[in-house]
C-alpha cells in the first residue's frame, strides 16, 4: 500500500525561503511509481473519477430527499453533526515540529514547498454555531446594463481622443440614489460571529450587513458596476466596532507602524495635493501633530492591526472570491486630503465618525468607465459638474464603481473617520483574458501546424500605421487568414488554466482565515501534543477512517497544473500583511489530486475518510490537516 509522506518527515532548512517555483526547496519525498503501477495508472484514475462522480451524485440525491421532507435547506444532515465538538481553546501560534526523516514510500506523495518556521497568529472568536439558510445569489452581467438616464454634462478630456458616441455612461437615476432609513439593525449584526459551514454564505451575510437595508440581490442587479448607492441610516453606531480614534491611538502605541509603508500624511490646498511623510515609525504625538495642522491621515492596511476590519474583510473575500482591501481616512475639520481622481476598485465608503462632504462625477469618456487603473490627480476644471453631492454622517454608506471621479472634504466643526472597503481590483474579463491568451496560444501552436508557418514575405508592405487605411485585396485576404488563425487559439482547457491562475493569485492576496472557537477543536490550530517520559513529543492525530473531513473554507485552496506538476496553492499560512511571504503551495501526485477534487466538489458537506479515493487515506487527510486546510469531525 502506498502512503502519503508526512509534511513533517524531514526537517525544514532554516535558511530556506519559499518561492513560487519551489526551485530552492528540498522536497520531502520524490514522486515515483513502479512500472506495474504505470501500466494501470490510467485505469485506476478513471475508476476513481467515476467513484468521485458517484459519491457526489449520491450525496445530491440524499440532499434532495431531505429537502422534500424538511422546511429548511442548505444545511448538512444533523446526524453528521453529532461528532462535532467545541472548546474555547486559545492558541496564538502552532509550533513547528520536525520529526525524524522517514524512508519515502511508494505511491501517493505530498511534498512541502514552503519553509515557514512558525504558523501565523489566528484570532480566536468566541461564537455560537448558527446555520445559514441563504443560498448564494448568482447574477450575470452584460454591457446592456451600463445605461445613463441623467442629463448631466460630461467635460471632454484635454487630450484629443476618438470617442465612441454610442457608448453610454454607467450612471443612471442619480436623483434617486439616496435611501433614507430609520435606525434599524439587520438580523445578522455586523459583529455577530457565526460558524456556519459554508464560507460563501457567511461572506454573503457579512456583505448584507455592510449594505443593509438594500438586499444583496437588488444591489448586484441594479447598482454593482452601474451606479452609486447612498444609504443614510440615522444610526451613528452602525460601523463603530470597526475602528475609532481611540483604537487608532492604541494601535500606534502597540505596533511598529511606519510612514509610507502603512500610513500616509496628506493635504490638498489651493489645488495642490502633497504628501508629508517623514521616515520611520509613526508615533502618536507626531501623527496627532500633523492632524492638528490640518493634514489627513490615511492607513493602507488597517485589517492587519484592527480586529474589526480584519473580521469584515476576511469574510467578504470568500463572497467576492478576490482580495478585499481596506483603507481608513482620518481628516480634521474643514480640510481635504486628496485631489479629485478615480480608482480601479469597487469602493464602499463606511462612515464611522464625524461628517464628510462627498462629490461624485461622471467618467469623462467611455474609456474611463470601470477603469482598470487609477487616474492621476485632476484639477477642478477637468471634472465638470457633480452628479451627486452628499454629507455622510456616522453609520452611512456610499458605494461607487470603478472610474467614478470623486473628492471629499470635511465640513466646519466636524472631523471625519471612514473606512473604504475595496474589491474587484484587476478582476475583470480583460484580466482573465490576459492570463488566457498566452497559454491558449502556446497550446494551439503545438496543435495547429498553420500557426507555426512563417509569415508572408510581403506582410510588412500591407500592415502597419502607414498602411492602416489601405483596402487592397491582399490586405483583406491576410486579415481573413489571421482571423482564422485566431479562431484556432480558443481552447476550453486554456480557459480552465486561466481561471486557475486567477484563483492562484487570490491565494497569495488573501487574508489568513479567521478561526472560530468551534473550529479550534476540529482543526490543527486546536491540536494537542503528548510529552513522553523519554523527552520526545508525539502529535495526536484526531481522526480515523470513520471520521469525516471537509475543507476549512470554500476558497481555502486551489488545485493548479503548472510546470508539468500538480500543486495546491493555499492561504492558511499567509500573513495579514499584504504579500509579506511568497505563495504557499504543496506539490501532489494524481492520486492525491483525486482526493482534493472530491473535497472541493463536496464542500461544504463532509466526506468520510474511508470514502476518499486515495491509497493511504489517513496520511492524505493528515497532510491536509497539518496545513490547516480541513476540519475533522469524529474521533
UniProtKB/Swiss-Prot annotation:
<dbReference type="GO" id="GO:0005730">
    <property type="term" value="C:nucleolus"/>
</dbReference>
<keyword id="KW-0560">Oxidoreductase</keyword>
<comment type="function">
    <text>Oxygenase that can act as both a histone lysine demethylase and a ribosomal histidine hydroxylase. Specifically demethylates 'Lys-4' (H3K4me) and 'Lys-36' (H3K36me) of histone H3, thereby playing a central role in histone code.</text>
</comment>
<keyword id="KW-0223">Dioxygenase</keyword>
<protein>
    <recommendedName>
        <fullName>Bifunctional lysine-specific demethylase and histidyl-hydroxylase NO66</fullName>
        <ecNumber>1.14.11.-</ecNumber>
        <ecNumber>1.14.11.27</ecNumber>
    </recommendedName>
</protein>
<dbReference type="GO" id="GO:0005506">
    <property type="term" value="F:iron ion binding"/>
</dbReference>
<feature type="compositionally biased region" description="Polar residues">
    <location>
        <begin position="141"/>
        <end position="156"/>
    </location>
</feature>
<keyword id="KW-0804">Transcription</keyword>
<dbReference type="GO" id="GO:0051864">
    <property type="term" value="F:histone H3K36 demethylase activity"/>
</dbReference>
<dbReference type="GO" id="GO:0034647">
    <property type="term" value="F:histone H3K4me/H3K4me2/H3K4me3 demethylase activity"/>
</dbReference>
<keyword id="KW-0479">Metal-binding</keyword>
<keyword id="KW-0539">Nucleus</keyword>
<dbReference type="Pfam" id="PF21233">
    <property type="entry name" value="RIOX1_C_WH"/>
</dbReference>
<comment type="similarity">
    <text>Belongs to the ROX family. NO66 subfamily.</text>
</comment>
<feature type="binding site">
    <location>
        <position position="343"/>
    </location>
    <ligand>
        <name>Fe cation</name>
    </ligand>
</feature>
<dbReference type="GO" id="GO:0140680">
    <property type="term" value="F:histone H3K36me/H3K36me2 demethylase activity"/>
</dbReference>
<dbReference type="GO" id="GO:0005634">
    <property type="term" value="C:nucleus"/>
</dbReference>
<dbReference type="InterPro" id="IPR049043">
    <property type="entry name" value="RIOX1/NO66-like_C_WH"/>
</dbReference>
<dbReference type="InterPro" id="IPR039994">
    <property type="entry name" value="NO66-like"/>
</dbReference>
<keyword id="KW-0805">Transcription regulation</keyword>
<dbReference type="InterPro" id="IPR003347">
    <property type="entry name" value="JmjC_dom"/>
</dbReference>
<feature type="compositionally biased region" description="Low complexity">
    <location>
        <begin position="84"/>
        <end position="99"/>
    </location>
</feature>
<keyword id="KW-0156">Chromatin regulator</keyword>
<dbReference type="Pfam" id="PF08007">
    <property type="entry name" value="JmjC_2"/>
</dbReference>
<dbReference type="GO" id="GO:0016706">
    <property type="term" value="F:2-oxoglutarate-dependent dioxygenase activity"/>
</dbReference>
<keyword id="KW-0408">Iron</keyword>
<feature type="domain" description="JmjC">
    <location>
        <begin position="295"/>
        <end position="440"/>
    </location>
</feature>
<feature type="binding site">
    <location>
        <position position="341"/>
    </location>
    <ligand>
        <name>Fe cation</name>
    </ligand>
</feature>
<dbReference type="GO" id="GO:0045892">
    <property type="term" value="P:negative regulation of DNA-templated transcription"/>
</dbReference>
<feature type="binding site">
    <location>
        <position position="406"/>
    </location>
    <ligand>
        <name>Fe cation</name>
    </ligand>
</feature>
<feature type="region of interest" description="Disordered">
    <location>
        <begin position="1"/>
        <end position="115"/>
    </location>
</feature>
<keyword id="KW-0678">Repressor</keyword>
<feature type="region of interest" description="Disordered">
    <location>
        <begin position="141"/>
        <end position="190"/>
    </location>
</feature>
